[in-house]
């Protein structure tokens, strides 16, 4: 048995235990988990790229096959209903042959409606987990997406199994390879479009396999937080200032989410990247079990305020910068989020398995995690420092604008901004930085 198989066996045991617990709590007999269905483009005969239900891929890495089902009760061997139609128009999924196949009772469907032949007699006592409620109703499944079940599963998804951690390590190893190729491509004078091609070639995944749309931003485009335009226009060397890439990789359904920023030449912006990089590594060292993630985010704002002071961008005290929202202008997003089956993984606001919600602080509305940090959790840590026109203009017109060095801000605007993002695991004996240990 391979090491991956051994890790997967333990992973499945954990999922079975969680399933037993929530079924007992809710008086249910089982979960019918639907991989999903394709969505037809309006007034067209083509479908959008298929994206699998994350509740389905938690159990096994079947990521590209709609109309599959899992029937799980936490006790018996999980039943996988695997869709293999007779179809000469499209590629049919290969027969399962991977490290996970022995852990499932695999049955085949040639038509989606054949799932009805495999449902248990007491299907009214089974919950449906999936995005097609009309299918659940048609099949007579009892409860569609019960909130108590989803809350329980989402809360516990924050605690990664050894198998999940190995998938995330591999996603970082491969992702780092792509980031290095992207940097080399930028330094060779490539366009955003060409850089993205270099990244995808290095990691061996196309746009449909990637966990999210790659952000490949040259110069001012780095000030657009979710920039995915991918300009094919090459920028002349004399007008080339900076490059930000935020891109990940999918391994068995688990995502890496990595960001780096590079300067075209030495100078003040390169020094600013180095300074923020140092602050990012130091804030990672402050991750401890029992500390709330929102406290870490606030501490990062203190660090950023001191950096704004040291670089003479803002002439205010640290507390004043934070209290008046000046640091939010330069760092408007959250410090990070849970990472796993989804890039912004589930459970970031849940305080218990019942789903008790703790919103982001009013001062930091875009923070995606308010959980207490615990062993086994995986986060991104991604501080930023940006020069965003739509945020800088209100600051310039306000009272605090008098304390900003606008000459320096104007000199840095063409660079867009900086983001540095690592993926980290909290262990009992410290933090494992999956990204740095992969060589980036």
From Swiss-Prot:
<keyword id="KW-0464">Manganese</keyword>
<dbReference type="GO" id="GO:0046872">
    <property type="term" value="F:metal ion binding"/>
</dbReference>
<dbReference type="GO" id="GO:0008235">
    <property type="term" value="F:metalloexopeptidase activity"/>
</dbReference>
<dbReference type="Pfam" id="PF00557">
    <property type="entry name" value="Peptidase_M24"/>
</dbReference>
<dbReference type="InterPro" id="IPR048819">
    <property type="entry name" value="PepQ_N"/>
</dbReference>
<keyword id="KW-0479">Metal-binding</keyword>
<dbReference type="GO" id="GO:0004177">
    <property type="term" value="F:aminopeptidase activity"/>
</dbReference>
<dbReference type="Pfam" id="PF21216">
    <property type="entry name" value="PepQ_N"/>
</dbReference>
<comment type="similarity">
    <text>Belongs to the peptidase M24B family. Bacterial-type prolidase subfamily.</text>
</comment>
<protein>
    <recommendedName>
        <fullName>Xaa-Pro dipeptidase</fullName>
        <ecNumber>3.4.13.9</ecNumber>
    </recommendedName>
</protein>
<dbReference type="InterPro" id="IPR000994">
    <property type="entry name" value="Pept_M24"/>
</dbReference>
<keyword id="KW-0645">Protease</keyword>
<feature type="binding site">
    <location>
        <position position="382"/>
    </location>
    <ligand>
        <name>Mn(2+) 1</name>
    </ligand>
</feature>
<dbReference type="InterPro" id="IPR022846">
    <property type="entry name" value="X_Pro_dipept"/>
</dbReference>
<comment type="function">
    <text>Splits dipeptides with a prolyl residue in the C-terminal position.</text>
</comment>
<dbReference type="GO" id="GO:0006508">
    <property type="term" value="P:proteolysis"/>
</dbReference>
<feature type="binding site">
    <location>
        <position position="257"/>
    </location>
    <ligand>
        <name>Mn(2+) 2</name>
    </ligand>
</feature>
<feature type="binding site">
    <location>
        <position position="337"/>
    </location>
    <ligand>
        <name>Mn(2+) 1</name>
    </ligand>
</feature>
<keyword id="KW-0482">Metalloprotease</keyword>
<keyword id="KW-0224">Dipeptidase</keyword>
<dbReference type="GO" id="GO:0102009">
    <property type="term" value="F:proline dipeptidase activity"/>
</dbReference>
<dbReference type="InterPro" id="IPR001131">
    <property type="entry name" value="Peptidase_M24B_aminopep-P_CS"/>
</dbReference>
<feature type="binding site">
    <location>
        <position position="421"/>
    </location>
    <ligand>
        <name>Mn(2+) 2</name>
    </ligand>
</feature>
<feature type="binding site">
    <location>
        <position position="421"/>
    </location>
    <ligand>
        <name>Mn(2+) 1</name>
    </ligand>
</feature>
<keyword id="KW-0378">Hydrolase</keyword>
<dbReference type="InterPro" id="IPR052433">
    <property type="entry name" value="X-Pro_dipept-like"/>
</dbReference>
<feature type="binding site">
    <location>
        <position position="246"/>
    </location>
    <ligand>
        <name>Mn(2+) 2</name>
    </ligand>
</feature>
<dbReference type="GO" id="GO:0016795">
    <property type="term" value="F:phosphoric triester hydrolase activity"/>
</dbReference>
<dbReference type="InterPro" id="IPR029149">
    <property type="entry name" value="Creatin/AminoP/Spt16_N"/>
</dbReference>
<dbReference type="InterPro" id="IPR036005">
    <property type="entry name" value="Creatinase/aminopeptidase-like"/>
</dbReference>
<dbReference type="GO" id="GO:0005829">
    <property type="term" value="C:cytosol"/>
</dbReference>
<feature type="binding site">
    <location>
        <position position="257"/>
    </location>
    <ligand>
        <name>Mn(2+) 1</name>
    </ligand>
</feature>
């Amino acid at each position: 048995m391979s090491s991956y198989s051994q890790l997967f066996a333990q992973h499945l045991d954990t999922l079975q235990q969680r399933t037993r617990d929530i079924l007992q709590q809710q008086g249910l007999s089982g979960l019918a988990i639907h991989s999903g269905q394709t969505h037809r483009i309006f007034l067209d005969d083509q479908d959008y790229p298929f994206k699998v239900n994350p509740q389905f891929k938690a159990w096994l890495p079947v990521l590209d096959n709609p109309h599959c089902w899992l029937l799980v009760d936490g006790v018996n061997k999980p039943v996988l209903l695997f869709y293999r139609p007779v179809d000469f128009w499209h590629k049919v999924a290969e027969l399962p042959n991977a490290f996970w196949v022995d852990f499932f009772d695999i049955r085949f469907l040639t038509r989606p409606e054949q799932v009805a032949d495999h449902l248990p007699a007491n299907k009214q006592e089974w919950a449906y987990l999936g995005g097609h409620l009309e299918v659940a109703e048609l099949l007579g499944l009892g409860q569609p997406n019960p909130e108590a079940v989803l809350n329980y599963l989402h809360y516990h998804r924050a605690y990664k199994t050894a198998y999940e951690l190995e998938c995330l390590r591999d996603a970082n190893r491969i992702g780092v390879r792509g980031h290095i190729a992207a940097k080399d491509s930028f330094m060779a004078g490539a366009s955003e479009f060409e850089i993205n091609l270099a990244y995808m070639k290095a990691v061996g995944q196309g746009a449909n396999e990637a966990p999210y749309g790659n952000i490949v931003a040259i110069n001012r485009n780095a000030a657009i937080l979710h920039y995915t335009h991918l300009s094919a226009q090459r920028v002349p060397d004399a007008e080339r200032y900076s490059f930000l890439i935020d891109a990940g990789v999918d391994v068995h359904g688990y995502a890496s989410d990595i960001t780096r920023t590079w300067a075209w030449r030495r100078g003040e912006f390169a020094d600013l990247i180095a300074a923020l990089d140092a602050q990012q590594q130091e804030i990672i060292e402050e991750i401890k079990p029992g500390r709330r993630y929102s406290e870490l985010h606030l501490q990062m704002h203190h660090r950023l305020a001191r950096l704004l002071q040291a670089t003479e961008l803002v002439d205010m005290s640290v507390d004043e910068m934070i209290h008046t929202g000046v640091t939010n202008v330069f760092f408007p997003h959250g410090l990070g989020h849970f990472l796993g089956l989804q890039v912004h993984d589930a459970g970031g606001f849940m305080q218990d398995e019942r789903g008790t919600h703790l919103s982001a602080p009013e001062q930091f509305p875009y923070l995606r995690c308010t959980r207490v940090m615990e062993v086994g959790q995986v986060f991104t840590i991604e501080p930023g420092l940006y020069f965003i026109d739509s945020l800088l203009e209100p600051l310039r017109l306000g009272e605090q604008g008098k304390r900003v060095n606008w000459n320096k801000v104007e000199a840095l605007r063409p660079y867009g901004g900086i983001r540095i993002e690592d993926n980290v695991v909290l262990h009992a004996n410290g933090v494992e930085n999956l990204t740095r240990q992969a060589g980036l």
